[in-house]
Amino acid sequence: MNGLAVKGPFVLGAALAERELAALLRRRTATDGSVGGRLQVAGRDYLNFSANDYLGLADHSTIKAAFKEGIDCYGTGSGASPLVTGYSRAHQQLEETLADWLGVEAVLLFNCGFSANQAVLKALLGKDHLLWQDRLNHASLQEMGSQLPCKMKRFGHNDMTALERQLEPNRGLIVSEGVFSMDGDQGPWPELARLAAQSGNWLMIDDAHGLGVLGPEGRGTLAAQGVAPASVHIQMGTFGKALGVAGAFVGGSRELVDYLVNFARHYVYSTHMPTAQACAVSKSIELVRAADESRAHLARLITRFRQGTAALGWQLGASDTPIQPLLVGESSAALQLAARLRDRGVWVSAIRPPTVPVGTARLRITLSAAHREQDVDRLLKALGPCSGSASWEGIHHG
């Protein structure tokens, strides 16, 4: 105890006890390292099927060398917000590289995807606007949408008929994801682009989990689905998943970026990402653009895993991306299955409410190009035959 009185206006213990009783209490696990699809915890080695390091770049020697060189040149921190002295030539070069890669006019860097998403919504939407969101959008988008003065309307997951019924002309912003973080399926971007253009509303993609993995040169969901970058007004992506570093960006028109520089409080009032980090991300993009074989290997692993789980009788979501959700149903059952896998040397995280809807607790299994075929086979052996699980049918409707 730190000597402060426990009593007061906040009932913390009761809230924690309630979550623990419902098998929803979250606890952190301190790892001793995570490299190349492996994880070490308390001196024991595990196969790691929980990370978002989709291309296995988080321990790449070339990226690490770029990071170290950046530290030698620029130090360990940027030292200020980007509008003071925290914006360097290395940041500018990264923005230009991203704009060229993704086919947008300009890019703005953020410290993380959560702040990038919230910065955009808060800067753009006022009381006279409308915001349309997929029900399964990331918590950063849902949370900010609920706090804004505009009216937020949520449509059923990937339900374009429902969205079209809700739309009003020239009223605001439609937001959806490229690859949904808990289900691994993709948004229908040709149809989203059509509806946005038809209604005169802006369109934003959160492509945190598609960037680097999908499309030619890893340009993401839009490129994979043949949607022109100009059809989507705002692109958000992150560097901490397939790119193996950390940070995020927002891309679009030069006017959009200039506006965010002036009105996005998350950008204006935050210390900028370390310059050395920008150097590492720039090097990562070089590798990602040339990583066709890694993406092909990853696709083969996904196919192998899906075929193997089908043979064992497990229920997977309709995903062809590295995110493979194995539906369990009850939170306690998901925790028990995750514990069983850990006993067998495989680390997979159980995802429970409120991250996912009640009754849809799951194992969020993520594959990486760092995995080998024998790693996938070991995961399948650890899972074993299904002894009964929930069904995906009808989960996302209504």
Curated annotation (Swiss-Prot):
NCBIfam families: bioF
Cofactors that this protein relies on: pyridoxal 5'-phosphate
Species in which this protein is naturally found: Aeromonas salmonicida (strain A449)
Protein name per its UniProtKB record: 8-amino-7-oxononanoate synthase
Phylogenetic classification of the source organism: Bacteria, Pseudomonadati, Pseudomonadota, Gammaproteobacteria, Aeromonadales
InterPro entries for the chain: Aminotrans_II_pyridoxalP_BS, Aminotransferase_I/II_large, AON_synthase_class-II, AONS_Archaea/Proteobacteria, AONS_Proteobacteria, PyrdxlP-dep_Trfase, PyrdxlP-dep_Trfase_major, PyrdxlP-dep_Trfase_small
Pathway membership: Cofactor biosynthesis; biotin biosynthesis
Catalytic reactions of this protein: 6-carboxyhexanoyl-[ACP] + L-alanine + H(+) = (8S)-8-amino-7-oxononanoate + holo-[ACP] + CO2
Matches recorded under CDD domains: KBL_like
BP terms from Gene Ontology: biotin biosynthetic process
Positions that bind substrate: R26, H138, T355
Subunit-level organization: Homodimer.
Enzyme Commission number(s): 2.3.1.47
Modified residues (N6-(pyridoxal phosphate)lysine): K241
MF term (GO), any: pyridoxal phosphate binding
Positions contributing to pyridoxal 5'-phosphate binding: G113, F114, S181, H209, T238
Keyword Transferase in annotation: yes
Function: Catalyzes the decarboxylative condensation of pimeloyl-[acyl-carrier protein] and L-alanine to produce 8-amino-7-oxononanoate (AON), [acyl-carrier protein], and carbon dioxide.
Family classification: Belongs to the class-II pyridoxal-phosphate-dependent aminotransferase family. BioF subfamily.
Keywords assigned: Biotin biosynthesis, Pyridoxal phosphate, Transferase
